[in-house]
Protein backbone atom coordinates (compact mmCIF):
# COMPACT_ATOMS: atom_id res chain seq x y z
CA UNK A 1 0.00 0.00 0.00
CA UNK A 2 1.34 3.42 -0.89
CA UNK A 3 2.15 5.89 1.86
CA UNK A 4 0.32 9.21 1.84
CA UNK A 5 3.65 11.02 1.41
CA UNK A 6 4.88 8.91 -1.55
CA UNK A 7 5.43 10.94 -4.73
CA UNK A 8 3.50 9.73 -7.76
CA UNK A 9 4.47 10.61 -11.33
CA UNK A 10 1.41 11.04 -13.51
CA UNK A 11 0.95 11.79 -17.21
CA UNK A 12 -1.87 13.91 -18.58
CA UNK A 13 -2.29 12.42 -22.06
CA UNK A 14 -4.22 14.29 -24.74
CA UNK A 15 -4.44 14.51 -28.52
CA UNK A 16 -5.73 17.60 -30.30
CA UNK A 17 -7.10 18.27 -33.77
CA UNK A 18 -4.12 20.60 -34.21
CA UNK A 19 -1.62 22.09 -31.79
CA UNK A 20 -1.48 25.89 -31.75
CA UNK A 21 1.82 27.52 -30.91
CA UNK A 22 2.28 27.84 -27.15
CA UNK A 23 -0.70 25.65 -26.26
CA UNK A 24 1.29 22.94 -24.42
CA UNK A 25 3.14 25.65 -22.46
CA UNK A 26 -0.20 27.17 -21.44
CA UNK A 27 -1.44 23.80 -20.16
CA UNK A 28 1.90 23.26 -18.34
CA UNK A 29 1.64 26.66 -16.67
CA UNK A 30 -1.91 25.94 -15.49
CA UNK A 31 -0.99 22.50 -14.10
CA UNK A 32 2.15 23.90 -12.45
CA UNK A 33 -0.06 26.40 -10.58
CA UNK A 34 -2.03 23.60 -8.89
CA UNK A 35 -1.36 23.51 -5.16
CA UNK A 36 -0.45 19.83 -4.85
CA UNK A 37 1.75 19.57 -7.97
CA UNK A 38 5.52 19.56 -7.39
CA UNK A 39 6.94 19.35 -10.94
CA UNK A 40 5.71 19.55 -14.54
CA UNK A 41 7.32 18.71 -17.89
CA UNK A 42 6.25 17.82 -21.42
CA UNK A 43 7.72 14.42 -22.25
CA UNK A 44 8.29 12.90 -25.70
CA UNK A 45 5.63 10.59 -27.07
CA UNK A 46 5.86 7.89 -29.72
CA UNK A 47 2.39 8.71 -31.04
CA UNK A 48 0.57 11.93 -31.92
CA UNK A 49 -0.57 12.59 -28.35
CA UNK A 50 0.98 14.99 -25.86
CA UNK A 51 2.22 13.63 -22.53
CA UNK A 52 2.44 16.21 -19.76
CA UNK A 53 4.27 14.64 -16.80
CA UNK A 54 3.61 15.96 -13.32
CA UNK A 55 4.32 14.82 -9.78
CA UNK A 56 2.16 14.94 -6.69
CA UNK A 57 1.89 13.16 -3.37
CA UNK A 58 -0.16 9.95 -3.25
CA UNK A 59 -2.67 11.64 -0.94
CA UNK A 60 -3.41 14.26 -3.64
CA UNK A 61 -3.22 12.05 -6.75
CA UNK A 62 -6.95 11.80 -7.50
CA UNK A 63 -7.63 15.50 -6.94
CA UNK A 64 -4.55 16.49 -8.98
CA UNK A 65 -5.64 14.21 -11.86
CA UNK A 66 -9.11 15.77 -12.01
CA UNK A 67 -7.69 19.30 -11.75
CA UNK A 68 -5.11 18.61 -14.50
CA UNK A 69 -7.88 17.52 -16.89
CA UNK A 70 -9.78 20.67 -15.93
CA UNK A 71 -6.67 22.76 -16.74
CA UNK A 72 -6.61 21.22 -20.22
CA UNK A 73 -10.27 22.10 -20.78
CA UNK A 74 -9.72 25.67 -19.52
CA UNK A 75 -6.78 26.10 -21.90
CA UNK A 76 -8.90 24.81 -24.81
CA UNK A 77 -11.75 27.17 -23.92
CA UNK A 78 -9.40 30.16 -23.51
CA UNK A 79 -7.70 29.52 -26.86
CA UNK A 80 -10.94 28.96 -28.77
CA UNK A 81 -12.46 32.12 -27.27
CA UNK A 82 -9.81 34.21 -29.06
CA UNK A 83 -10.69 32.87 -32.52
CA UNK A 84 -13.12 34.28 -35.06
CA UNK A 85 -16.05 32.14 -36.18
CA UNK A 86 -14.35 31.12 -39.45
CA UNK A 87 -11.11 30.00 -37.82
CA UNK A 88 -10.63 26.33 -37.05
CA UNK A 89 -11.25 25.58 -33.37
CA UNK A 90 -8.95 23.29 -31.39
CA UNK A 91 -10.70 20.08 -30.36
CA UNK A 92 -9.70 16.97 -28.48
CA UNK A 93 -9.45 14.06 -30.91
CA UNK A 94 -10.06 11.55 -28.14
CA UNK A 95 -10.76 11.66 -24.41
CA UNK A 96 -7.89 12.93 -22.29
CA UNK A 97 -6.56 10.63 -19.58
CA UNK A 98 -4.29 10.70 -16.57
CA UNK A 99 -2.01 7.69 -16.12
CA UNK A 100 0.39 6.71 -13.35
CA UNK A 101 3.96 6.20 -14.55
CA UNK A 102 6.43 3.94 -12.74
Describe the function of each predicted region.
Residues 1-53, 57-102:
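Long, contiguous binding/interaction regions
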Amino acid sequence: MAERSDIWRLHLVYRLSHSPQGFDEDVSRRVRALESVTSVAVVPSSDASTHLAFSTRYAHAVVAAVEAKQCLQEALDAHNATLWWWQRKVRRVDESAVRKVA
